Amino acid sequence: MKTIIAEKPSVAREIARIVGATKREEGYFEGGGYAVTWAFGHLVQLAMPDGYGIRGFVRDNLPVIPDSFTLIPRQVKAEKGYKPDSGVVSQIKIISRLFNGSEQIIVATDAGREGELIFRYLYHYIGCATPFVRLWISSLTDKAIRDGLRNLEAGSKYDNLYLAAKARSESDWLVGINGTQALSIAA
């Protein structure tokens, strides 16, 4: 079986229809030798400072620069701080099972830097080793999807796009976290 991952459910529905994955399951469609699943945008994000043992806004902690960034499921505001979004955690479990049980993953997240990051962060978070290829389309017409599926590209072709997105994500984190803490301490 091959697993196709789209960035959102509406795109997954269109692709599933084209590949004959008409059986609706929890978190994916199945049929025709495919499982077609989806993210809800960024399912995985960089951990906040407390994920690195840094609590509160303390001048001596600045600048906050992790040795390496940690990926965690997307968080939602809780009574005290943040907690993992239960719907996201559930979808990640479904995707993990599909990815690890597949012979190949077809990446159908949006054709661009963020779409690539959404998939790669999830792939790395899961610790997946299943080979993947890229469906690079900018239209959801039946013809565009079919043509894209006939012309899948090596996932490695998009490594630099992923690295650019990762650099942007990490630099946004560094500027945002350190800027917020520095300005709050100075106020």
Q: Model-derived features: where do they sit?
A:
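Intrinsically disordered, low-complexity regulatory segments
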Residues: 1-186
